[in-house]
């Protein structure tokens, strides 16, 4: 059995505005193993995106904790969380969030620049990842010169350029047509096999979720069931 990479222990998240309290997450507990491909399925507003923000250290739970590689995030400073996000975690969103004035190569290189890698390593590694997603021939093109599917591939290359242990993906194909969505999920599976990267994908699409090795369902801020979707139509 693979080692547990990330563990959630009774995560709760509450927002308060004046006298109004809104509970978004209720005692969420689960784990992700090294190299695992997992989906969390739920409708819009079910708490999936809030959960990803907590897992990535972008927000703080009201109670409970996230443990990454045996280390509680609650014990980490802001600087240590930022380093964790840069070195050990990758993020993919529904919208690519590429910098419009930078080329594909420069966008992919950004996490390496932030991590203060050597210039020669930055260029070679960024180009290597563009090649891995089939876009090395588009390295010098800006986002406006790329198709929607190509832009998302660049975003995936950027998420994986630092060899993260885990990639958190929030509706990564939600802005793509069926053909490009299928291509992106095939790419994630290939990168998982080649690099051993674990993926946690949140989505409302059961057809996409079934491609993952494990699926959990979220409703109203609660994990309600472990689904069996393999081969579902």
Curated annotation (Swiss-Prot):
The complex is composed of two ATP-binding proteins (LolD) and two transmembrane proteins (LolC and LolE). Its main location: membrane. Part of the ABC transporter complex LolCDE involved in the translocation of mature outer membrane-directed lipoproteins, from the inner membrane to the periplasmic chaperone, LolA. Responsible for the formation of the LolA-lipoprotein complex in an ATP-dependent manner. It is a peripheral membrane protein. Its EC number is 7.6.2.-. InterPro entries: AAA+_ATPase, ABC_transporter-like_ATP-bd, ABC_transporter-like_CS, ABC_transpr_LolD-like, LolD_lipo_ATP-bd, MacB-like_ATP-bd, P-loop_NTPase. It is an enzyme of class 7 (translocase). ATP binds at residues 42-49. It is found in: Cell inner membrane. GO terms for cellular component: plasma membrane. This is Lipoprotein-releasing system ATP-binding protein LolD. GO terms for biological process: lipoprotein localization to outer membrane; protein localization to outer membrane. Belongs to the ABC transporter superfamily. Lipoprotein translocase (TC 3.A.1.125) family. The lineage of its organism: Bacteria, Pseudomonadati, Pseudomonadota, Gammaproteobacteria, Enterobacterales. The gene is lolD. Keywords: ATP-binding, Cell inner membrane, Cell membrane, Membrane, Nucleotide-binding, Translocase, Transport. Pfam families: ABC_tran (PF00005). NCBIfam families: LolD_lipo_ex, PRK11629.1. GO terms for molecular function: ATP binding; ATP hydrolysis activity; transmembrane transporter activity. Residues 6-233 form the ABC transporter domain.
């Amino acid at each position: 059995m693979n080692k547990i990479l990330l563990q959630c222990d009774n995560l709760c998240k509450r927002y308060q505005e004046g006298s109004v309290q809104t509970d978004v997450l209720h005692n969420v507990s689960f784990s992700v193993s090294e190299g695992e491909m997992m989906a969390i399925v739920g409708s819009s507003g079910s708490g999936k995106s809030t959960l990803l923000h907590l897992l990535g250290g972008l927000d703080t739970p009201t109670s409970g904790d996230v443990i990454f590689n045996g280390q509680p995030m609650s014990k980490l400073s802001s600087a240590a969380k930022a380093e964790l996000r840069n070195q050990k975690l990758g993020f993919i969103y529904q919208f690519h969030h590429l910098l419009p004035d930078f080329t594909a190569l420069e966008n992919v290189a950004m996490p390496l620049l932030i991590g203060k890698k050597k210039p020669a390593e930055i260029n070679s590694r960024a180009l290597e990842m563009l090649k891995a997603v089939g876009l090395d021939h588009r390295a010098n093109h800006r986002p406006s010169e790329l198709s929607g599917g190509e832009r998302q591939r660049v975003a995936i290359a950027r998420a994986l350029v630092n060899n993260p242990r885990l990639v958190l993906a929030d509706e990564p194909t939600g802005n793509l047509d069926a053909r490009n969505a299928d291509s992106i999920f095939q790419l994630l599976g290939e990168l998982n096999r080649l690099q051993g990267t674990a993926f946690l994908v949140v989505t409302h699409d059961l057809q996409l979720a079934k491609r993952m090795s494990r699926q959990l369902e979220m409703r109203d801020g609660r994990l309600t069931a472990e689904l069996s979707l393999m081969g579902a139509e």
